[in-house]
Amino acid sequence: MPALTVPPGVEGIVAMHELPDPAWESRWTRIVVADDIKERVLNFILFSLKQRARMDAVRLPIHGLIVLAGPPGTGKTTLAGGLADQAARTLGESVLFVEVNAHAFPSQMLGESQRSVARLFDRTLPDLARRGGPTIVLLDEVESLAVSRAGASLETNPVDVHRATDAVLAGVDQVARACPNVTFVATTNHSVGVDVAFLSRADLVEDIALPNVAAVEQILRDTLEPIVGSGLIHAALAPLARACVDAHLDARRVRKLVIRALASRRELALKPELLRIEDVAAALRAETKVTAAVPAETR
C-alpha cells in the first residue's frame, strides 16, 4: 500500500500511511525488543485509542504519549511503525500513521519554527483527527523538537528554540484534550536533551537498550537463515553474539555485519548462500578495528 500524500503546505510531516499494510507487519514481528516492552506499548496504544475519551482527565491524566528512549540503531523508529501496524490489526480497523520529524520544519529563525510547530498541533493534526479513525503520530528524534530548556543556553540555542519547545508542550496538551483518537509515539536517542516537562507528560517512557547476547543471537539467526538456510550452524551463533555484545553493537549494526561479510569476497557477493559464521566473525573484527580508529566524539 503506497504512502498517502502529505497535504500541500504542511510542514513537519514527512509521510503518512494507512495501516495495516502487509509490508509493515515485519516491523513488529521481526524487531527484536523485549517481549514485555512490546506487550506494554501495544496495550497502552489500544487503551489510549479506545478508552481515553471515557476517562476523567484529572483523575487519570492521560496525554496519549509514549516515549521510546535509547541509543541509535536499537529499533525505536521501526518499533513505532510496527506498533501502529499491529494496533490496526488488533483493532480490526484502519489506523492513520503520521510521521513528524523536527528536521522537516523550516529554519529556526525569526520565530518561523515556533509558528510551524504551533500550526502542526493546532491545525494540521486536529484536521487529520477529524477523520474520526485512530491516529498514531510519530515524533521522531523528539530531542530536536522539545529541546530541554534547562540544558540549552541562549548562546548556542536561539530564543526561538525555547519558544518552539513551549509550542510543543502546549500542542501536546491541546491534542490530548481535543483529540482522544490521537496517540503520540516519540523517539529519542538522548533523553537528557528532551525537556523535562515533555517527559513528565509521557504516559510511558520505555528504555530500548542495546541488545543482550540472547537478542543478538536472535537477530543473527533472523538475518542469516533466509540467506544460508540449512547451512547455518546454530551452535556457532552464541560466541559470535557474545563478541557483538562485547563490541557494544546496536541491533542495526549487527544486521549490517552480514552485509559487510557478503561484501568481503566476490564469491559471497555472487553466491550469498556460501556465507558462513566465520565470515561474519571476520566482518566483526574488521568493524571493531574501524570503529576503534574513529575518535569517540565524531561517532
Question: What residue spans do the PLM features occupy?
Answer:
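C-terminal alpha-helical "lid" subdomain
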Residues: 1-30, 213-299
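Pre-Walker A (pre-P-loop) alpha-helix and adjacent loop at the N terminus of AAA/AAA+ ATPase modules
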Residues: 23-64, 126
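Walker A/P-loop
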Residues: 62-98, 122-127
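Short glycine-rich substrate-engagement loop in P-loop NTPases that contacts/grips substrate
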Residues: 96-130
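Substrate-gripping "pore-loop 1 plus following alpha2 helix"
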Residues: 116-120, 150-177
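Conserved P-loop NTPase "ATPase switch" module shared by AAA+ and STAND
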Residues: 129-153
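A short helix-turn-beta junction within AAA+ P-loop NTPase domains corresponding to the substrate/partner-engaging
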Residues: 196-210
